[in-house]
Amino acid sequence: MDVILLEDVKTLGKKGQIVKINDGYARNYVLPKKLGIEATAKNLNDLKLARKREEKEAAEELAAAKELAAKIKECTVTVSMKTGEGGRTFGTVSTKEVAEEAKKQLGLDIDKKKMKLDVPIKALGNYIIQIKLHKDVTAELTVKVVEK
């Protein structure tokens, strides 16, 4: 019996795959547990339409991420920190603070978990932060640390 998998099944395959399995295994395990559905003409057509929809949504997400990356590249976020001698800050500038300042100053809602600091920001100056917006799109945000 041909079955379209609705979920990843370790022994059979990944979600959306069409696999040939024994009738008994399909009727007694895969179908009752909603791990897959029978591969009828209607279900195959539904699968094809769902794949097209997913591809279209993925393309839209990628385009939106590229647009946001272009917007972010042009922007600079300014963070004010208390400093001691030699321009050293009291504490470090975290991704949380950068995300909050980006929201305040630029209106950009960026998740702090998507930001990557190469080195801790402990001094005044300009820094580049990598932001992973999409699996294929990474943006660079310029952060300027100034004295409070």
Swiss-Prot record:
Belongs to the bacterial ribosomal protein bL9 family. HAMAP family: Ribosomal_bL9. GO terms for biological process: translation. GO terms for molecular function: rRNA binding; structural constituent of ribosome. InterPro entries: Ribosomal_bL9, Ribosomal_bL9/RNase_H1_N, Ribosomal_bL9_bac/chp, Ribosomal_bL9_C, Ribosomal_bL9_C_sf, Ribosomal_bL9_N, Ribosomal_bL9_N_sf. It comes from the Bacteria. SUPFAM superfamilies: L9 N-domain-like (SSF55658), Ribosomal protein L9 C-domain (SSF55653). Binds to the 23S rRNA. The keyword Oxidoreductase does not apply. One of its GO terms (cellular component) is ribonucleoprotein complex. This is Large ribosomal subunit protein bL9. Gene3D superfamilies: Ribosomal protein L9, C-terminal domain (3.10.430.100), Ribosomal protein L9, N-terminal domain (3.40.5.10). Keywords: Ribonucleoprotein, Ribosomal protein, RNA-binding, rRNA-binding.
